Amino acid sequence: MAKFNKDSVSGTLTVVVLLSLICSLIVASAAVLLKPTQDIQKQLDKQKNILQAAGLMHENTNVQETYAKFIEPKIVDLATGDYVEDVANFDAKAFAKDPATSVAIKPEDDKANIRMRAKYAEVYLVKDEMGQTTQVVLPMYGNGLWSMMYGFVAVQPDANTVNGITYYEQGETAGLGGEIANPNWQKSFVGKKLFNANNEVALTIGKGASADKEHGVDGLSGATLTSKGVDNSFKYWFGTNGFGPYLAKFKATAGAN
């Protein structure tokens, strides 16, 4: 049997290949081991943002305890606005990619530029100490300049007044479009009305929009396209193809909960 010569070309290549395989196994193992922790952190961040949109997130808030006490997740059929109970393992992103669980959006209706959406959405009823519904937090996403922007919007029982918003996932330009994640800008949405007297989506984000005290929010300076993306997201998700049917029913029932 020939003696292994690590200094030969073939020996060097063998060592490199073995080291590469070992490193790959280490990285793969680490990814598998870390995934449960990453999933927990992702879920915790989601809960934190839901609480933040609802105005329940404070400096010393225990996220998991507060979420469990005051938030009730529900699955909604967007076409009817009804709650559904038989949707297992709901994942909005995964459902939106599956033809069996998604809806193709007509180009003329696709204001948020998302092309497909899940047939269902998870909404979050916010309860008080007595178990009464005080608001609902709705997921919202749409394209900005560089990225898909994911956020939450809290709406009061009148199904019209914004109680808060937050963006938790986006890749817009830092210091410009990335300011959609700035709490100071997000506060400018509080108290704004989503709809006009004709029940049309009237909330508008753009340059000088705050002149309309009831419906307007000034866009971000130097981030016109990102601001337009936020505006378009509201126009789509609160219209008839988004949460429009659900909000009509929420308004009719929230006061009775």
From Swiss-Prot:
<dbReference type="GO" id="GO:0005886">
    <property type="term" value="C:plasma membrane"/>
</dbReference>
<comment type="function">
    <text>NQR complex catalyzes the reduction of ubiquinone-1 to ubiquinol by two successive reactions, coupled with the transport of Na(+) ions from the cytoplasm to the periplasm. NqrA to NqrE are probably involved in the second step, the conversion of ubisemiquinone to ubiquinol.</text>
</comment>
<dbReference type="Pfam" id="PF04205">
    <property type="entry name" value="FMN_bind"/>
</dbReference>
<feature type="transmembrane region" description="Helical">
    <location>
        <begin position="13"/>
        <end position="33"/>
    </location>
</feature>
<dbReference type="GO" id="GO:0016655">
    <property type="term" value="F:oxidoreductase activity, acting on NAD(P)H, quinone or similar compound as acceptor"/>
</dbReference>
<keyword id="KW-0285">Flavoprotein</keyword>
<protein>
    <recommendedName>
        <fullName>Na(+)-translocating NADH-quinone reductase subunit C</fullName>
        <ecNumber>7.2.1.1</ecNumber>
    </recommendedName>
</protein>
<keyword id="KW-0739">Sodium transport</keyword>
<feature type="modified residue" description="FMN phosphoryl threonine">
    <location>
        <position position="224"/>
    </location>
</feature>
<keyword id="KW-0597">Phosphoprotein</keyword>
<dbReference type="GO" id="GO:0010181">
    <property type="term" value="F:FMN binding"/>
</dbReference>
<keyword id="KW-1133">Transmembrane helix</keyword>
<comment type="subunit">
    <text>Composed of six subunits; NqrA, NqrB, NqrC, NqrD, NqrE and NqrF.</text>
</comment>
<comment type="similarity">
    <text>Belongs to the NqrC family.</text>
</comment>
<keyword id="KW-0830">Ubiquinone</keyword>
<keyword id="KW-0520">NAD</keyword>
<keyword id="KW-0288">FMN</keyword>
<keyword id="KW-0406">Ion transport</keyword>
<keyword id="KW-1003">Cell membrane</keyword>
<dbReference type="GO" id="GO:0006814">
    <property type="term" value="P:sodium ion transport"/>
</dbReference>
<dbReference type="InterPro" id="IPR007329">
    <property type="entry name" value="FMN-bd"/>
</dbReference>
<keyword id="KW-0472">Membrane</keyword>
<keyword id="KW-0915">Sodium</keyword>
<keyword id="KW-0812">Transmembrane</keyword>
<keyword id="KW-0997">Cell inner membrane</keyword>
<dbReference type="InterPro" id="IPR010204">
    <property type="entry name" value="NqrC"/>
</dbReference>
<keyword id="KW-0813">Transport</keyword>
<keyword id="KW-1278">Translocase</keyword>
